[in-house]
Amino acid sequence: MLDEMAHAGPEHLDQQFIEGYDRKQGYPDAETDIAAFEAHGLDQTSSVVDFGAGTGQFAVPAARRFGRVTAVDVSPAMVSALRAKAAAAGAGNLDCVRGGFLSYSPGEPVDGIYTRHALHQVPDFWKAVSLQRIAGMLRPGGVLRIRDLVYDFAPGEAGAVFADWFAGAAADPAAGYTAADYAEHIRTEHSTFRWLLEPIITASGFTISDVSYQGKLYGAYTCVKSA
């Protein structure tokens, strides 16, 4: 079995990094992702699991709209920070659990699963295993929402795409991701090509109902488990 802690990225285990995590992430708005679930019928009676939940940028607002949200992260420090944020928000229906794609099991089937910028932490073989496990956690017709850094270009375009990416990076590492951060991601993380990821998703028992890309690097998928 893969050591999920070893693939978490050392920064996600570091308390100082976590304290500035939301600022570095740019405070992403969860509304689009929540709306994607609601468009497929999820509501205040629904159960949702958030894998790689981090500091709860999705999980906390999602707890206001869904019946039960379980936030899962491999980092003990992230889980601790998330529990504090959930308590401050009065989110009594938000459970915070240490675990990952390969280790967590919800017991009863759930209605929706969300993951943002976490699937790239595992190699492609383990992405396939993770997605099959996720399919097993969802009820028939359940919804998977994926956001991740995915390469939507031919290998020969990599130099030009990465040069543009680096040019738009933050100068201050406290305020955002720098060119050095992006270069480290390419070297050490497991982002994959779109033309590899999508067949893995469908082979895992999902129909891709919606997909959108920001530039050639950031993909968002809404997937429905086959009945």
Region spans (language model):
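Conserved class I S-adenosyl-L-methionine
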Residues: 1-43, 46-52
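A short glycine-rich, Lys/Arg-flanked "PGG" loop and its adjoining helix->strand segment in the class I
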Residues: 128-140
